[in-house]
Design a protein with these regions (language model features):
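Outer-membrane beta-barrel proteins and related beta-barrel translocases across Gram-negative bacteria
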Residues: 1-246
Length: 246
């Protein structure tokens, strides 16, 4: 006799396997958010043929919203950086929005293209380590399709960080000093940004002055700074000035 018993298995890892979230929101309508997580990377065991020490978590997204349409994306997270959950990922998302005019507020909106997207990179690179110094490079970049993307598709992130920074930097640290340089960019021209192209800084720890008992510590920096208005700011400022004059 032949027995056939189908079964459904699910990984015990909270981020692996298939997960879905149904629900309803005023600006989404009925929705079903789908995610499938698998591990990538690692080396193949020559005996078992299985991958070991997999370090890259990939989460594949397929979302359906009755008022917004379909959205797809993929998130990659470096599990080797578990000590800092705010670093080590690349997140991408794209949605064909069937009604970009929908808002959770009564404020009027400018015309928004139906192609909505996000590209986000947060990563820390170990550039060089020696017994006395550590050199690292950081990238914190978020590129959005429009100023309302986070409000519409990531309300939690919008509440915590409605206008994300875009910074690239490198720093060297030792017991005596920290030397670094970073650049703040205006990747999203619809946001106002305090750009720094670049800024160089030096912090040094407390140390004796000429081998005396007097200690000194300090910080110094130099850079090129510029205040960049968002693309809609001139219109807004002009309107506020006209209203104030009347």
């Amino acid at each position: 006799p032949i027995f056939w018993l189908p079964y459904l298995s699910q990984s015990m890892g909270s981020e692996l396997g298939y997960q879905f979230t149904p629900g309803s929101r005023s600006n989404w309508g009925a929705f079903l958010l789908n995610k499938y997580g698998i591990m990538l990377g690692g080396k193949e065991n020559p005996i078992s043929g299985r991958k070991e020490d997999q370090w890259l978590l990939s989460e594949w997204l397929f979302d359906i919203r009755s008022k917004r349409g379909i959205g797809v994306g993929v998130d990659f997270t470096d599990q080797r950086l578990d000590s800092n959950r705010n670093l080590g990922w690349l997140k991408t998302y794209y949605a064909t929005d069937i009604d970009p005019t929908i808002s959770r507020t009564s404020l009027p909106r400018e015309q928004i293209d139906s192609n909505r997207y996000k590209l986000e990179l947060k990563y820390r690179f170990d550039w060089h380590n020696s017994p006395s110094t550590t050199t690292i490079a950081d990238a914190n970049l978020t590129y959005l399709s429009d100023r309302h993307y986070l409000e519409d598709f990531e309300p939690r992130n919008y509440t915590l960080n409605p206008q994300p920074d875009n910074i690239i930097g490198i720093q060297q640290r030792s017991d005596r000093y920290q030397l670094g340089a970073f650049t703040r960019l205006q990747l999203n021209d619809f946001y106002e940004a305090d750009t720094r192209l670049p800024e160089i800084y030096l912090d040094h720890a407390k140390r004796p002055i000429f081998n005396s008992s007097i200690l000194h510590e300090g910080s110094s920096s130099i850079g090129y700074y510029k205040e960049e208005l968002g693309s809609s700011d001139p219109v807004r400022l002009r309107s506020e000035a006209e209203n104030a004059a009347t």
